């Protein structure tokens, strides 16, 4: 991984970790919050905690307005752009002959340009050129991270297909209680108002994570998942970047 992205991951883990000292927490934001002129109050993230509800007696995602105050406003823009960069970099193909620093600058400019296009289309209520790409290649309408005792799992919401794409923390190899983790993520989809209308949870697990890949594939029928065929390499319209989902085993769960 490029050093620039490693630092961004560390920043995300630090901020989310400070919010998740007691159980799991979800920190997310809408891409349109990055529009120029957005006031600081509207930059606040959506925060949910996975905890026992006095209403039901079971763990569920509950809004945490007090917790949102603990994320300093000065960090929010940096956190949001870091989340976008790290999620999109997971699917970007780095040419072996290109120097890392030069590639990163090109990648960063490319992503910023496409985020701007997504914001403009959303603000004007019109279809976006992004929508023709496969889900993993699209700039998301929302980005977020779930922090728990097993790591920081990243996600993005693709409105055009109504799918939530989740990247399991690659550092959590072999340590995830898959049943509990999947229930928690499905309940995030069910309980988060900004994800209403979600039709599928699409989980991306690194092929190098042999333990979790094996467990997921072995229990596909039991957990109600469907193995999704990889799309492979896809160029962007300007042919500046190549995206690919080949690094991952992709499993879809209907919501």
Swiss-Prot record:
GO biological process entries: viral translational frameshifting
Pfam families: ODC_AZ (PF02100)
Disulfide bridges in this chain: none
GO molecular function terms noted in the UniProt entry: ornithine decarboxylase inhibitor activity
InterPro entries: ODC_AZ
Its job: Ornithine decarboxylase (ODC) antizyme protein that negatively regulates ODC activity and intracellular polyamine biosynthesis in response to increased intracellular polyamine levels. Binds to ODC monomers, inhibiting the assembly of the functional ODC homodimer, and targets the monomers for ubiquitin-independent proteolytic destruction by the 26S proteasome.
Subunit organization: Interacts with ODC and thereby sterically blocks ODC homodimerization.
Family membership: Belongs to the ODC antizyme family.
Protein name per the record: Ornithine decarboxylase antizyme
UniProt source species: Eremothecium gossypii (strain ATCC 10895 / CBS 109.51 / FGSC 9923 / NRRL Y-1056) (Yeast)
Protein's gene: OAZ1
